[in-house]
Amino acid sequence: MATFKLVISDPKSGIAKQVEITGAETEKLIGKRIGDQIPAKELNINLNELFGKEFPEDVKLEIRGGTDKDGFPMRPDIHGPRRVRVLLSKGPGFRPKEKGERRKKTVRGNTISPEIVQVNVKLVY
């Protein structure tokens, strides 16, 4: 059974909280992609208690990214749950030191699998 660290960010206040989920809640995340939205009720997360303020009941969590067990970041433009080496010039997983620099980097695809350890989500009201 997989265990995920869920980093929940509130874009209105700029606050981020970390929650660990296990069991049936993790099965609801496996197979989802970056950009998908999940109702917070499905994951049994009490956002009002976690953030200390009131949220509407229909609040959703939008998947924004994550990292796998070895620290490789997820990229929205690589499809599937696989790990690949790609030539990057910008974006998640690469910070160029010079203008126009490109380099091969190992990154993870955009689909959540049991190898993912951390999932970054943001609140969508």
UniProtKB/Swiss-Prot annotation:
It comes from the Archaea. One of its GO terms (cellular component) is ribosome. Signal peptide: none annotated. Residues 90-109 are annotated as: Disordered. Keywords: Ribonucleoprotein, Ribosomal protein. GO terms for biological process: translation. The keyword Ribosomal protein applies. Pfam families: Ribosomal_S6e (PF01092). GO terms for molecular function: structural constituent of ribosome. Belongs to the eukaryotic ribosomal protein eS6 family. Part of the 30S ribosomal subunit. HAMAP family: Ribosomal_eS6. This is Small ribosomal subunit protein eS6. The gene is rps6e.
